[in-house]
Amino acid sequence: MATIDLVRHAEPDITIHDDFLRPLTSAGRRQTQQLVASLHQYPYTAFFSSPLKRAVDTITPIADDHGLPVQKNELLVERKMPAWLPNFSDYVNQQWQDLTFFEKPGESIHQVQERYLSFLYGLPSSAFVAVGSHGTAISSLVEAAIPGIGYHFFSKLGYAAVTRIEMHAGNVVHLAVWEPKSKTFKVLK
């Protein structure tokens, strides 16, 4: 069974509108150090990341702690947006109401879901990996595993959150979220 810990990037500096170059805030860098301590105990065999700076900067200290490199993968980018949207919340609501909705040159929640699933299907069945990721992408996988809860999950997902997916024969068999207070994973499925 493959185990994938999807690590949402820590708090980004949203004053930087360039999606690829948006860095973490000082609070985000502190969140990353908390992740290093929380995830130190897990025997990861590989680290992957979206190539976006905020995801790479979140996962790299964890990979460094494990003595492993980070492999950037284009399949792991955040949902492609048509542009910087002043009405972001309205756009997001519409996308979660209709998983196929998007404005060009962006992409739909369903397209993000398919892209991420193709990455997961390519992992070895014995993989234990951590992935530097994004809120919409992670929530799209939750939606695939438990239809109807993706938007609610997205609306509650904090920065530097960890979502664990366990897959067997191409199916999500377990889904859990990291609970920092109890320092354990809470099972959703």
Residue ranges and their predicted role:
Residues 41-43, 123-127:
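Glycine-rich phosphate-binding loop signature in dinucleotide/nucleotide-binding domains
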Residues 98-125:
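Internal catalytic-core helix/loop-beta-alpha segment
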Residues 4, 126-136:
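Generic beta-sheet signal
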